[in-house]
Amino acid sequence: MKVGFIGLGSMGAPIARRLARSGFEVTGCDIAPEMLEAFDEAGTKRSADPMETARQTDMLGICVRTDAQLEALVDGGALFEALGKGGIVILHSTVSPDLARKLAALAKTYGVGFVDVGVSGGGPAAIEGQLSLFVGGEDGDVERAMPWFEAIGKSIAHLGPVGRGQEAKLLNNLISIANYGMSAAIVDVAVALGFDREQIIAALMAGSAQSFALKVAPGFVRPRSGLGAPSSLMGLYDLLKKDVELCRNLPPSDPVAMEALLASCDVMLARIKRAAAEAEASK
């Protein structure tokens, strides 16, 4: 099956690579020359033209960063027209659920299917086909896209119509970022009380407080694999802040609880921003 994938960043490129290794004929597309050059998977094609990529494929994956980028890419429906009747769009970007629903309705007028698929697990999990997928879309579209999902995911949850994939992904990110922020803050309190950082983390991890966030959050923004570089830290900050702002627009059943969650997220964002400033000052 011929598929296109637009957006070859830290998540898009690994997904596209996994698809190629799973037998799909993949054309990777990105308007950034450095991203396109880095996509060197054997047996794939490369393109800097999203419209041409759409014309040459049956399924089109999208993993751009922001709502504005996604709307510019769709170009009022021109992208769907290029893909053609019977094509299907698989949206892996994390964007506004309302925008996903709006674009799905627009795609339908061109005879194009549309599913929104939030992913969790990161690039390494994508390469291994071990992502968790949060899927929103009509049953028929989801069924058609299932070979794609099975290639990249270990867990595939079809949660309802288009928009549900985005909402579930935002909930996942809200929990994750809040947990990171809370765990990092707790360790800071412990250190202020005079505990050894590593010793108290090990002790807490042996009790009911244990979590993935507690294990990794205190060192989350320390230099490792280039993440300690100022530009990398600010890139992480911008990405997480975008997701937190999208979460602020979710309708809360309990405004007080939502504010508490968002406050924990803000702790993590402030921590990353501070680390970026410290890294910049130490250059």
Predicted regions and their residues:
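NAD(P)+-binding Rossmann beta1-loop-alpha1 motif at the extreme N-terminus of oxidoreductases
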Residues: 1-63, 87, 158, 192
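Rossmann-fold dinucleotide-binding core
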Residues: 3, 8, 94-173
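Hydrophobic beta-strand scaffold residues
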Residues: 26, 46, 113-115, 156, ...
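Rossmann-fold NAD(P) dinucleotide-binding segment
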Residues: 50-112
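Active-site-proximal catalytic alpha-helix in oxidoreductases
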Residues: 133-136, 157, 161-193, 205-216
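Interdomain hinge/lid region at the active-site interface
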Residues: 212, 216-275
